[in-house]
Design a protein with these regions (language model features):
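Active-site-proximal alpha-helix that buttresses catalytic centers in soluble enzyme cores
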Residues: 39-311
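Positively charged n-region of N-terminal signal peptides that target proteins for export
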Residues: 11, 19-23
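Bacterial N-terminal signal peptides
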Residues: 23-33
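Intrinsically disordered, low-complexity, compositionally biased regions/tails
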Residues: 10, 31, 38-40
Length: 311
């Protein structure tokens, strides 16, 4: 079959190929015009990526996660927890890159994190939110339409695959191992329950794909002293009890990058970990792109409705 295929190609290309010069040039011009308009349509909507921010290595991992997207759209990152200063800088940067509108993708574990503050800053909410906030919310100077993503990494089934890979890569004898997935966790009890429920849903993939003794999820409630102390005691007791039963606990952090404070929390206890968060992993990039595309569609729909209302 392969030799017949090669023969047919040889016969075809051994014949003279005669194309009138006018047709050839017209084809080239059409191709260039088409590719130019495609690039233009790709780059009209900028991607403003919000991320927590941390060490140079932490920030570098986020930068790397969007490196492959920069060829398709203007990209700017606003580090900080809904910090109006970095949001304004990133917005201005996108406009300087030629963005005519902006899709804001929030690279947070929970979709609830800083959602109200961000919506207020981008003039999508009329009133400033009250309560826990690292930065005083303020309205940004907007000169282009903006749309905001609502979901977080906890809502993405793609993250389940990352958790499965982390567990399998760390496993030696799964029947004698228990998985413990630990997240940052919020202060509000009801919101924390939502975190745990979503983490447990993603952890189901490990239960299905692995043969571990148990798969467990919990949060540390890191920024709330009283609640953190109770969580630490519970987590440490679990690791200690599993060791006493002859099982090894594999700790997987459900955080964007790194191991956070867990080395300190579990100091002196026997466990296994590689300290990898969700990054680096191409599936986070896939999630960012999908959030960008859905937020971009919201922008296009909104602009279409605005045009129709003015007709």
């Amino acid at each position: 079959t392969h030799s017949l295929f090669r023969l047919s190609l040889n016969k075809r290309f051994n014949q003279p190929l005669l194309i009138p010069m006018r047709v050839f040039l017209l084809g080239i011009l059409c191709f260039l015009a088409g590719s130019g308009s495609s690039q233009s349509s790709q780059s009209e909507v900028g991607l403003l990526l919000m991320a927590h921010g941390g060490t140079e290595t932490w920030n570098g991992a986020v930068e790397e996660s969007v490196a492959s997207l920069r060829a398709d759209m203007p990209v700017s990152i606003a580090f900080g927890m809904a910090n109006p200063a970095t949001l304004q800088t990133a917005l201005d940067d996108l406009i300087s890159q030629g963005a005519k509108s902006v899709a804001v993708v929030r690279l947070f574990v929970s979709g609830e994190s800083f959602l109200k503050e961000t919506a207020y800053s981008f003039q999508l909410e009329a009133h400033a939110p009250s309560g826990h906030s690292m930065h005083e919310p303020r309205v940004l100077d907007l000169s282009v339409p903006v749309s905001l993503s609502a979901g977080g990494l906890l809502d993405a089934q793609l993250m389940a695959g990352i958790l499965v890979d982390r567990a399998i890569n760390l496993s030696i004898d799964s029947s004698k191992e228990s998985i413990l997935i630990v997240g940052h966790g919020p202060g509000d009890d009801a919101e924390n329950e939502r975190w745990v429920s979503k983490m447990d849903h993603l952890a189901e993939s490990i239960r299905e794909d692995g043969d571990f003794h148990s798969v467990n999820v919990s949060t540390l409630r890191e920024d709330w002293t009283g609640k953190r102390e109770a969580a630490e005691i519970e987590l440490q007791a679990f690791v200690r009890d599993e060791a006493a039963a002859g099982r090894t606990v594999i700790i997987i952090p459900f955080r964007l990058f790194g191991f956070g404070p867990y080395a300190e929390v579990f100091d002196g206890l026997s466990y296994r970990a590689d300290s990898l968060g969700l990054l680096p992993d191409q599936r986070v990039t896939e999630w960012i792109r999908s959030q960008y595309m859905s937020t971009k569609e919201t922008l296009i729909h909104s602009e279409t409705m605005n045009h129709q209302s003015h007709d």
